[in-house]
């Protein structure tokens, strides 16, 4: 009798076990086996316009057949369609459909590396940032040119660029405009540590003024080693007080003329360009322009804070086109340097 019961048990138990193993194998195959058909990590972007079908369509281009079938089953039999989370999601070669499902359902994003570019205008900044974010350039530009929003962070629309310190930051692709500005404000405060703030204070300059001067330095030279020297020359002009210049010597910085005209490709600045009525015209106006003419590099900012102490008041690009400058104490010396450079430009046919 016992042998008969054992036989009956084995008769049903073994097939059941085989079926169970088969089911487990299928579950593993569809939900836990490698989802991606690609050998490296891929990323998908889910935005506000997506639904279950479009999400599956985006993933199907990188998925195995069993992987996309498994994910489709999970998405169809869950509440995912009621709350689709935007974001940038990583799909690694080892991830199964179930892990992908959990990531996109719970909003477990992979951050993007957002590099703040050294651009000249807010519209260009907006365009460059939008290339890495879900935000479009028009939305970013609208925020950056909103006086109330700028004032909330301690700036105006002419100085808001001062808050963007060039670096690479990890942010989420679907970051909101407010959170983006909050992050930039925190990074700016982190950059302006006690040491840098003290240096600016000793120079009698605000952080925005330092950044504005740094933007001119960066436009004048790409040579980081020379930037402290150039900064020292412009600082001398800012602080000069005598009978001829009771309020300071005009900076007469050619890059500000390019900015005033929005003609950034100019190779030479002629006298007819110097009469433009603009607060950025440092030939007509004494002191710094009302805001930076580009987002300056960290090297440019530190060049201002650590400027070389000398008594030069003039500089002119060297005639060898090395990207460096000849410095002069007097206008007469400067005219000689300028004549040599002008001759070199003419010889090369640069107009």
Predicted regions and their residues:
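N-terminal type II signal-anchor transmembrane helix
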Residues: 2-41
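Intrinsically disordered, low-complexity regions
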Residues: 4, 23-26, 88, 155, ...
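N-terminal start-of-chain detector that recognizes signal peptides
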Residues: 14-19, 61-63, 86-88, 139-144, ...
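Pocket-edge positions in alpha/beta enzyme catalytic cores
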Residues: 16, 44-47, 92, 202, ...
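Signal peptide-directed extracytoplasmic domains
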Residues: 28-192
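Bacterial extracytoplasmic/cell-wall-associated proteins, especially those involved in peptidoglycan
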Residues: 127, 134-138, 142, 149-351
């Amino acid at each position: 009798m016992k042998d008969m019961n054992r036989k009956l048990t084995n008769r049903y138990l073994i097939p059941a076990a085989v079926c169970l193993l088969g089911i487990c194998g299928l579950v593993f195959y569809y939900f836990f086996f490698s989802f991606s058909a690609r050998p490296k990590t891929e990323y998908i972007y889910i935005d506000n316009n997506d639904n279950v079908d479009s999400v599956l369509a985006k993933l199907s281009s990188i998925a195995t057949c069993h992987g996309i079938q498994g994910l489709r089953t999970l998405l169809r039999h869950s509440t995912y369609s009621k709350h689709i989370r935007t974001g940038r999601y990583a799909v690694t070669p080892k991830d199964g459909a179930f892990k992908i499902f959990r990531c996109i359902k719970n909003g477990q994003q992979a951050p993007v590396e957002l590099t703040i570019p050294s651009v000249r205008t807010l519209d260009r900044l907006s365009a460059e940032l939008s290339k890495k974010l879900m935000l479009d350039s028009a939305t970013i530009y609208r925020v950056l040119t909103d006086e109330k929003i700028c004032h909330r962070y301690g700036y105006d629309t002419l100085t808001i660029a001062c808050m963007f310190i060039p670096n690479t930051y990890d942010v989420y692709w679907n970051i909101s405009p407010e959170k983006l500005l909050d992050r930039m404000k925190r990074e700016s405060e982190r950059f302006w540590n006690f040491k840098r703030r003290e240096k600016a204070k000793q120079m009698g300059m605000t952080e925005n003024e330092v950044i504005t001067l740094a933007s001119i330095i960066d436009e004048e030279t790409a040579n980081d080693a020379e930037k402290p020297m150039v900064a020292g020359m412009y600082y001398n002009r800012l602080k000069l007080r005598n009978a001829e210049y009771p309020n300071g010597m005009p900076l007469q910085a050619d890059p500000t003329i390019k900015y005033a005209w929005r003609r950034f490709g100019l190779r030479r600045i002629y006298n007819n360009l110097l009469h433009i009525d603009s607060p950025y015209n440092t030939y007509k106006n004494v002191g710094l322009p009302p805001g930076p003419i580009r987002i300056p590099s960290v090297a440019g900012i530190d060049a201002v804070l650590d400027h070389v102490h000398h008594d030069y008041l003039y500089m002119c690009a060297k005639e060898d086109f090395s990207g460096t400058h000849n410095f002069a104490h007097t206008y007469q010396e400067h005219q000689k340097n300028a004549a040599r450079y002008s001759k070199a430009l003419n010889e090369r046919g640069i107009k």
